């Protein structure tokens, strides 16, 4: 029987040898006849269909097998179970994966970590994968595109395993590595691999290497690679050229590269010219930049908004107002819409060259592109630069727009009018803003209140405050604080107290600034005792006085020659951890000097120096008076110079 089996398998081998397959497969034979003695038999074997192959004879990947393997790996909850199921599945079919199929499975896995684990398993599933560079290329590419924090170390580990296993990569391996690594050391390692694997760099390899050096900002090596590309007769695409030009923007070498593009018949696009225009501007060659612009037009190219802005930035740097306006006019003619940055370049140029009167012409040129947003930007910018009349004129143009206005532009105009002292215009504007669909808010009212208070226009404050309470919006804590300070500034103490009491009855509650304003109002108008009462009141309400509170009240006591009270407040603020500033020391020094307490004033000055405060001009004025007293010099006492030392809380 053993002999029969041996003869049977020998006959099977004889039958199948001409079409031997490279993959382990089970064969089923059907016995068709046997000898009477049973010592020989005939069997019929049905060979499986051969694997489909491409035109070169390489087997095509079996898609159903790839999908099944991918589903087994990704569908399992446990990784070890997934790989075990895959191994069992392949064993049940007596199949092995081809390297291409393993590569496709790697590509189908959506997790880089899962791909790495499968890559480790591939040698046991695919006997011919050990020396396949394409499989290594696939896993390196997957890692290079991942966000794994240790992806660089993982790729280096794979390269080490390739070296140890004597696996030679191909030029695609090097290209992937160059595109992945970013530092010079790793790039040098890639070049060593080229020599080790006896590879020849192609145009794409040189392009990858050039871009890698540019990304790592190693511009000298990048230019060396470019020179090698020229010597080798390799070609670069427009993207690589533009990237190199942008990197060499501050270098004369950019001009050489630009000329090489023409010699090598690489068509220069609008981005190329934009880069070169910026380069000429950086090295101060404005005329050459204009020449490039004209050359670009001759070649039928059109700049986009970035290109036009770049050219106008160069012209602004060269103070070429006429040329900048000409370029702006052409920009509009070609249908390129200017943006805020375009207008900012022209506006700053006109302001710097004292030709702001030409702004109306610029606006007229781009009339069809003027929007509410552009008007708003110009109004805000002119207001910040202090050109109130021009801002107001543009604002009037903006007012004619039928669309809803922007709050920021109206706010900027209000601030400009108030800053220029045009409070009547500001009040009128405040009353008409709602016509443009902009709701007047508390900040707008506060801006106008603050300007009226500084100009002591109390009658307008009364009227506007009544209108605010009647029509809205509701006053906030800042409104009340501004009003208290404004009434105190003109000596209307009763009105300031009324506002403070109204604040207490409102939803807003007085804060430290409210009390500081009221204390300053009371003290400066002679009611020091009431100011002191308010000081105690704020402490009872849980508000901690700050340095402004103490300084204000100390100044009030100093003016009424109540030195002990002033000094007591100074000691109290130190105990409570409130650090005095230079204004506090100046007030107390002046108080002590005026009352002849020279020794205490000198001691106080020493404390001030120990605290690390720097004396100012007022400090030195008081010290000069102290020195003149110590030398017995007679002098005429001038008007109290301390008035106004304490800055308004607002």
From Swiss-Prot:
Transmembrane intervals: none
Annotated transit peptide: 1-23
PPR repeats: 132-169, 170-200, 202-236, 237-267, 269-303, 304-338, 339-369, 371-405, 406-440, 441-475, 476-510, 511-545, 546-580, 581-615
InterPro entries: Pentatricopeptide_rpt (IPR002885), TPR-like_helical_dom_sf (IPR011990)
Coiled coil feature spans: none
GO cellular component: mitochondrion
Subcellular location: Mitochondrion
UniProtKB keywords: Mitochondrion, Repeat, Transit peptide
Keyword Repeat: yes
A Pfam family per the record: PPR_2
Keyword Mitochondrion found: yes
One example of a Gene Ontology biological process annotation: response to abscisic acid
PROSITE patterns cross-referenced by the UniProt entry: PPR (PS51375)
Entries under SUPFAM superfamilies matching the protein: HCP-like
Primary site of residence: mitochondrion
NCBIfam families: PPR
Family: Belongs to the PPR family. P subfamily.
Protein name in UniProt: Pentatricopeptide repeat-containing protein At1g51965, mitochondrial
Organism name: Arabidopsis thaliana
